């Protein structure tokens, strides 16, 4: 299972989290986010990581030009679109960056939210399901209704996100079969400041199901 720790802002923490066994680090490229980090600071962190660890840039309603600007500086391995991007825009991103993994995030409010995913499946590589919040796009600490996902089989790899913590992750995964999990606030002391002990606990708990 892929384990993505999102909202990395400090090089030392990124290195430590990768060394513990996380398979992906997420960098928030959204200026209004408290976890924002610019491309000039992302690249030095990426350079210290093993090549087996994915570096994912998280964008929300950004233009193609903005995304391209970040990628000219930071050698990301994946682009996560966490806003209201249309299938047409996702297609454009994939055409512009065919060598990168394209992840589309969806904020799940009701079962109807899952229906909207269908039109994206053919134009992206990976899905990410997050909790719905009317005011924030992610990192809210809110959990989504895991029961809605009991029969979720999208035909694409997918991440489970939304309020996951070391304490609730095993319960969240009961009856679900995501290809990965994504945590941010659940392993933090404050936005952008990761708690290495919590990451350690998370990975130890995940080993119990393997």
UniProtKB/Swiss-Prot annotation:
One of its GO terms (molecular function) is phosphoribosylanthranilate isomerase activity. GO terms for biological process: L-tryptophan biosynthetic process. Pathway: Amino-acid biosynthesis; L-tryptophan biosynthesis; L-tryptophan from chorismate: step 3/5. InterPro entries: Aldolase_TIM, PRAI_dom, RibuloseP-bd_barrel, TrpF_fam. Gene3D superfamilies: Aldolase class I. Keywords: Amino-acid biosynthesis, Aromatic amino acid biosynthesis, Isomerase, Tryptophan biosynthesis. SUPFAM superfamilies: Ribulose-phoshate binding barrel (SSF51366). It comes from the Bacteria. It catalyses: N-(5-phospho-beta-D-ribosyl)anthranilate = 1-(2-carboxyphenylamino)-1-deoxy-D-ribulose 5-phosphate. This is N-(5'-phosphoribosyl)anthranilate isomerase. It is an enzyme of class 5 (isomerase). Its EC number is 5.3.1.24. HAMAP family: PRAI. Belongs to the TrpF family. The gene is trpF.
